[in-house]
Amino acid sequence: MTESVLDYMTRLGRAAREASRVLARASTAQKNRALQAAAAALDAARDELVRANELDLAGGRANGLDAAMLDRLALTPKVIDGMIEGLRQVATLPDPIGAIRDMRYMPSGIQVGKMRVPLGVVGIIYESRPNVTIDAASLCLKSGNATILRGGSEAIHSNQAIARCIQLGLAEAGLPAAAVQVVDTTDRAAVGALISMPDYVDVIVPRGGKGLIERISRDARVPVIKHLDGICHVYVDLAADVDKAIRIADNAKTQRFAPCNTMETLLVHQGIAEQVLPPLAAIYRDKGVELRGCPRTRALLGNEVLAASEEDWSTEYNAPILSIRMLDSLDEAIEHINRYGSQHTDAIVTENFTDARRFLTEVDSASVMINASTRFADGFEYGLGAEIGISTDKLHARGPVGLEGLTSEKYVVFGDGHVRT
């Protein structure tokens, strides 16, 4: 009899739970050996990876995937190099598991502290990019978590080929194959099953479009680490250094248009707008950025700026489009960001310490920056190494989620025959 999707996913979940107990007690050396061996297996399997990827690319073209999607799907030599290097980099990161902090004696004589431990089983749901398979598997493995990976159907052959390399690495290190499992079925019911198994899955991390993440957030029966939007702002304060403001606002928008930490709205104090906006508009024009502005912005810059609608202030474009608004005060800037933003990443450009401190305190975002581009909101730039994603939630992790974000803490208590009286 054919196994149902629910039975198949339950089998994966049960195996992952058992593997998670082995991983939780695995040594750092053992985990690093698995990562290094997986990197070597990827390097040796380049031809196999390319052949599998060609099947996915052919299927994508037949199904009408656009050029951008096909580009994200492709396993080029550069992408494969990046996956290999990513595994090796994660192997060099400090292992957070087992670290004990805040040990202190209580009046009763016991010692109390906190020990960092894995979450258990992490379910990853993602679209298109096969390299996410490596990113997610490596971080989960190093942090002592078993993982179940459900990639997009368009990348099924690539993900299976990558998974075989990871399995070789696990075997060489003496770790269970179920520590990293790739869902082999393309049936969408597998996603519904994965997010509905609290007995076997401890947390879900979705990576993909807003529709996917909204669905998972709505339907999941296990905790979700996610962000829905990247509506990031740069506010140019009255006390800003003009050169810094221009450099930061340029980089925050034009270094790359698609990432979630790209600026979507530029806020400028009206008292410095004449110095900042005209040169910035010329830069944006040369780089093909469409500008949409408030009435005062259009009065200053002219008809080349389209009229911004109310919807523009709350839109993540992921494209060469920028909204611009002139404001009268820092208060207005903070109110605008907290009203329209997505609590992802927001920056102020200012030489005024008091304004900077107010911005840090009152802007309710996962990353708040002073005199720096929003493009720095990234696990690598924060010294976390690789990241599994960025969270705009306040529980359990917030901001770029690296190794530590895939762990929890438990209290540990040391006594010497102590009893409570």
UniProtKB/Swiss-Prot annotation:
InterPro entries: Ald_DH/histidinol_DH (IPR016161), Ald_DH_C (IPR016163), Ald_DH_N (IPR016162), Aldehyde_DH_dom (IPR015590), Glu-5-SA_DH (IPR012134), GPR_dom (IPR000965). GO terms for biological process: L-proline biosynthetic process. One of its GO terms (molecular function) is glutamate-5-semialdehyde dehydrogenase activity. Pfam families: Aldedh. Keywords: Amino-acid biosynthesis, Cytoplasm, NADP, Oxidoreductase, Proline biosynthesis. GO terms for cellular component: cytoplasm. It is an enzyme of class 1 (oxidoreductase). It is found in: Cytoplasm. Its main location: cytoplasm. Pathway: Amino-acid biosynthesis; L-proline biosynthesis; L-glutamate 5-semialdehyde from L-glutamate: step 2/2. It catalyses: L-glutamate 5-semialdehyde + phosphate + NADP(+) = L-glutamyl 5-phosphate + NADPH + H(+). Disulfide bonds: none annotated. Its EC number is 1.2.1.41. Catalyzes the NADPH-dependent reduction of L-glutamate 5-phosphate into L-glutamate 5-semialdehyde and phosphate. The product spontaneously undergoes cyclization to form 1-pyrroline-5-carboxylate. Belongs to the gamma-glutamyl phosphate reductase family. PANTHER family: DELTA-1-PYRROLINE-5-CARBOXYLATE SYNTHASE, GLUTAMATE SEMIALDEHYDE DEHYDROGENASE. This is Gamma-glutamyl phosphate reductase. The gene is proA.
